[in-house]
């Protein structure tokens, strides 16, 4: 069975400080589960997830139905600490309200650029009440429907921490 020290060692070997990372390893049913919790919103979640999955994740699939086979799998879950994430979202609420007002006052109904960082852009769509984060190749990364100030704050945070 994998232990938390091994997981942290692999993360550290890839140049990431592990002081604000919590790791829990457990056996649930016939499966091993590795849960990594990031306690800093600026830690690279996708990169850490890729590192841990490459090193430890093992999932067996049925060759015909492609269903996950029971037993012997190791699943990896990486997420931000809920309280820290919500604090960061709440810190973006004022900016989010301003962006929603900006979108509402635009004559453009589809594809209005609200914010950008590097190759990522947040577009607003008044017609479908949607915001989308895409890259410069127009591949959608995330989207929110029936948007409110919290969704906009989450989008702004996702853009900032990308």
Predicted stretch roles:
Residues 103-106, 156-157:
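Extended, compositionally biased alpha-helical segments that mediate assembly or anchoring
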């Amino acid at each position: 069975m994998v232990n938390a020290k091994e997981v942290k060692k692999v993360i550290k070997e890839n140049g990431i400080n592990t002081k604000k990372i919590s790791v829990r390893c457990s056996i649930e049913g016939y499966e091993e589960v590795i849960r990594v919790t990031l306690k800093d919103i600026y830690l690279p979640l996708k990169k850490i997830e890729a590192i841990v999955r490459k090193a430890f994740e093992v999932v067996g699939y049925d060759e015909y139905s492609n269903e996950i086979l029971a037993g012997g799998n190791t699943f990896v879950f990486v997420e931000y600490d809920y309280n820290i994430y919500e604090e960061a979202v709440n810190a973006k609420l004022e900016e989010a309200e301003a962006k929603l007002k900006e979108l509402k006052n635009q004559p453009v109904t589809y594809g209005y650029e609200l914010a950008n960082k590097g190759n990522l852009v947040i577009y607003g769509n008044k017609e479908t009440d949607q915001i989308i984060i895409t890259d410069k190749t127009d591949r959608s990364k995330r989207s929110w429907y029936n948007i409110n100030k919290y969704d906009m704050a989450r989008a702004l945070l996702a853009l900032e921490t990308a």
